[in-house]
Amino acid sequence: MKVGLFIPCYINAVYPEVGIASYKLLKHVGVDVDYPMDQTCCGQPMANAGFEDEAARLALRMEEQFKNYDYVVGPSASCVAFVKENHPHILGKRDHVCMNSKKIYDICEFLHDVVRPESLPAVFPHKVSIHNSCHGVRELHLSSPSERNIPYYSKLRDLLSLVKGIEVFEPKRVDECCGFGGMFAIEEPEVSTCMGQDKVCLLYTSDAADDR
């Protein structure tokens, strides 16, 4: 299988080490991965702000960039969820069929559901606390949402359990929003900041904080 690595614009600009680590990780587990150099934003900021025509142009560009790959994999649940859930609507109104939505995965989802490694040659003898993102939980189903009465599961915890020496914890309110929410953080910065501070406090008071 041939995988195209989708790196969202905020990761490219602010956290490039995440993109590099994603590429190395996929290579390490035996994936034939490529990084299309001309890729750009998926269009989520424009769509969230109401500029659907601009978002559609970027969606079409992304379709062209990734059309020859079996899978599209990205290290961002939010951007992956936008492509999966919103690109078909945006492009469908313009008589274009969205192919990326059928083959795009968050990197954790891809490792868990497609690659399915039975072990990882990794050692991390520390306590860690999981951040369950809103889009990851409720749109990509990376873990069970707390508001639904269904059995607990966590694809993130499953993957981390393959790392030797690690102890995994979750905060008391496991999937509370961090306050980012894309445009919400820009339009409501004060509320967003307070929500982020609450989230940090939850993580700091989890059992993983004892390892500091």
Give, region by region, the residue ranges found by the protein language model.
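Short, structured active-site "lid" loops
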Residues: 50-71
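Glycine/small-residue-rich loop that forms an oxyanion/phosphate-binding "nest" at active or ligand-binding sites
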Residues: 89-96
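A short, acidic, amphipathic alpha-helical segment used as a generic capping/interface helix at domain edges
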Residues: 191-203
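Extreme N-terminal starter segment of soluble prokaryotic enzymes
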Residues: 1-3
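Conserved small/polar residues in nucleotide/adenosyl-binding loops
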Residues: 204-212
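Anionic-ligand binding region
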Residues: 146-163
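Immediate flanking context of iron-sulfur cluster ligation sites
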Residues: 29-38, 62-63, 68, 165-175, ...
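Local cysteine-cluster metal-coordination motifs and their immediate loop/turn environment
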Residues: 8-12, 38-48, 75-81, 131-139, ...
